[in-house]
């Protein structure tokens, strides 16, 4: 696919960019030679990129899966002791015998991908320009244990809405970067790459692509990055969209920390409090290890099944959904979707480098950050918490759109791409007037 030249309509020049000239030859990186793009000149060029895993890397992956040394079965009938043996063995069997990385690799390489060096780190990103002249530039940030994989289903509906149930007036230019230490981006070699620094890098990226003003979206770690974009660059960031917003009132955070029950909560607020309490009480094992000792996770770089189990253990609802997938059910994601993401972590050797973001972060997660630009909120029921509208209004005084959904969880754009896309179209439509 290639970018399409277009002319901005009158009055919309601040949200549209001229076409950059990509004259650098496309670079292909083979895992056996290098795992991330290398920029020997540390310049500011934007270089076309594609990835092809070596046959040797894929053979080694299968060998390691088959050679897994399994622990004994859990002593309970549920997942309270962690990822269940039967689930991870079903995943491993499918991964070794049926999964096809090359299929996903071809899908990824069909999209325009680039790398550019920002603040000493090569940043990989997908950049798909819409053919429609009114397209709004939208940068979308993933989280952990996600990646650019979780955003791919929304690229077509955003850039070519007329072909996906929308109208030309709903078009977006889409930029999907891999965070530093994730996927095909470089691994930082110095301290300091927290959400604030990543937000600054994203602003540099958008400037480098020619976008003076833009909108942004994110979930999981993409939420604080997106919020910091709005806090640091309110004149450039016209609005943001969040599906796991930092909107928990201080008194609720205090109640969770002290183990007390807040009073006077509406039903949806009580449910959100219970979701958060469960996560903080039962679901932070992975986060505590990565926050305190990310370098200790050597096993994740050596065992693909160990990596898969670690990723599956992120949150209870996502684990249950994935377990059902490998029992033969279909709930928005497929088995291949799950393994595309896990295999990307494996082939890029980013289990530890991605975990360091937890160690680097100094922001109070879930606490409002003082965002003062228009905000669009998507609230999904099996997210870590389904943010109540009352909390969202209090956290974001300029909230312009809120939608509560009956289905969907932590990986919103991946699990429910249609619902996610409708929110983005509807939420940002007023910016086009």
PLM-predicted stretches and their roles:
Residues 158-184:
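Conserved alpha/beta-hydrolase
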Residues 196-214:
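Conserved acidic catalytic loop of the alpha/beta-hydrolase fold
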Residues 101-103, 166, 179-193, 227:
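Glycine-rich "HGGG/HGxG" loop immediately N-terminal to the catalytic nucleophile
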Residues 157, 161-164, 211-262:
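Conserved hydrolase catalytic core segment
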Residues 281, 288-433:
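C-terminal subdomain of alpha/beta-hydrolase-fold enzymes, centered on the catalytic histidine
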Residues 135-143:
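Short beta-strand element of the alpha/beta-hydrolase
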Residues 56-129, 134, 346-349, 353-366:
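Non-catalytic accessory segments flanking enzyme active sites
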